[in-house]
Amino acid sequence: MTNIINGRQIAKQLNQETKTRVDKLKEEGIIPGIVVILVGDDPASVIYTRNKQKNAEKLGMKSILRKFPKDVSQAEVLQAIHHYNDDPTIHAILIQLPLPKHLNQTELIEAIAPEKDVDGFNSKNVGKLYNNEEGHYPVSCTSRGIMTLLHTYLDKIEGLNVTIVGRSILVSRPLQSLLINENATVTMVSLHTDNIDYYTKHADILVVAAGKPNLIKKDQVKPGATVIDVGINRMANHYLVGDVDFDDVKEVAKNITPVPGGVGPMTIATLMQQTVDLAEWNK
């Protein structure tokens, strides 16, 4: 029998734990604060930022949405980042991606103070993760959310073969480091990989983050595998589908995430979790 991984339910439990931590911080006079920087009016980005803001407010956090027009200058966004770096009531800064092409994404992310870099994309935090350093530092919220799902449904990760389809710096690469740090054997492939089926069919855990709807079919999946679908693709009929053909692959997978309702809710719940982490680590 296939387990449908209920990301919404696990996110709900995580949010309850986060709310308890927020209440405890408030007793100490600390209100966790997050600012989301949004450039332009891309419909998907607007929805994502509103969801993040609603979740933060629901958990009792301070939440600011800093909006800029799509033709904003690099200097204006940098000025805002520096302002929030210096604001003691803000513990977490997030830049909603993607950004317009005229903006230098790397420079903006590097401008965020590492101790407020809630998505873990600043090179100092990336380096700590890559080196498996001890201590406290944020990591990619989506990647950490995936790890939470895996820990919920699997007894162990150590020793398992993992294939990640996709090589993005936002999800795939930090997830690769998190898995390696738990002694998994990780292979990363892309749509340019020859004989991609060989790698997917040998995976105990298959993570698909390629941005191509219904890419993976059941004949590409090892029977009994755990399949994590990171893709979010809006089709012509307005339905959302993942990068995995869910109805097909669920016939062979032991555990599988749906789209929507799998990884997505975990990303936002983990963002809230890490905002509180930053408030606790830096109080």
Curated annotation (Swiss-Prot):
Domain of life from the UniProt record: Bacteria
Chain's role: Catalyzes the oxidation of 5,10-methylenetetrahydrofolate to 5,10-methenyltetrahydrofolate and then the hydrolysis of 5,10-methenyltetrahydrofolate to 10-formyltetrahydrofolate.
UniProt binding sites for NADP(+): 166-168, 232
Keywords of the record: Amino-acid biosynthesis, Histidine biosynthesis, Hydrolase, Methionine biosynthesis, Multifunctional enzyme, NADP, One-carbon metabolism, Oxidoreductase, Purine biosynthesis
EC number: 1.5.1.5, 3.5.4.9
Protein name: Bifunctional protein FolD 1
Pathway where this protein functions: One-carbon metabolism; tetrahydrofolate interconversion
Stored CDD domains: NAD_bind_m-THF_DH_Cyclohyd
A matching Pfam family: THF_DHG_CYH_C
Family the UniProt entry places it in: Belongs to the tetrahydrofolate dehydrogenase/cyclohydrolase family.
UniProt GO molecular function: methenyltetrahydrofolate cyclohydrolase activity; methylenetetrahydrofolate dehydrogenase (NADP+) activity
Species whose genome carries this gene: Lactobacillus johnsonii (strain CNCM I-12250 / La1 / NCC 533)
Annotated InterPro entries: Aminoacid_DH-like_N_sf (IPR046346), NAD(P)-bd_dom_sf (IPR036291), THF_DH/CycHdrlase (IPR000672), THF_DH/CycHdrlase_cat_dom (IPR020630), THF_DH/CycHdrlase_CS (IPR020867), THF_DH/CycHdrlase_NAD-bd_dom (IPR020631)
Keyword Glycoprotein: no
Catalytic activity entry: (6R)-5,10-methylene-5,6,7,8-tetrahydrofolate + NADP(+) = (6R)-5,10-methenyltetrahydrofolate + NADPH; (6R)-5,10-methenyltetrahydrofolate + H2O = (6R)-10-formyltetrahydrofolate + H(+)
Key word Hydrolase present: yes
Complexes and interactors: Homodimer.
GO BP terms: L-histidine biosynthetic process; methionine biosynthetic process; purine nucleotide biosynthetic process; tetrahydrofolate interconversion
